Amino acid sequence: MKIPNKIRIGGQDINVCIKDRLINEKLGMICLASGELDIAETFYDYKQCESSKGNTFIHEVVHGVLDTMGEKELSSNEKFVNTFASLLVDVIEEIVKANKEK
């Protein structure tokens, strides 16, 4: 999955950055207030592979969508966010694949 440099969530521009490391050794984080979504290149001593970065990107987008909707409780439920994001990744990849075949 190619990760874009910028996305929009609820009319708000969000800049997407790949950084070497994030605070507290997180894989990713989104801050709607600052309009930033960051993805870690390195997690502890391991490089995050491309598919993991793609999954992290969608995971953070799900947080951003839920926060924009005012669904703070759902957004703080990592089990829900992980499951929902992993299901979305599969659908998104199939859509991209179908569009490339045209």
Which residue ranges define each predicted feature?
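Short, Lys/Arg-rich amphipathic alpha-helical interaction segments
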Residues: 94-102
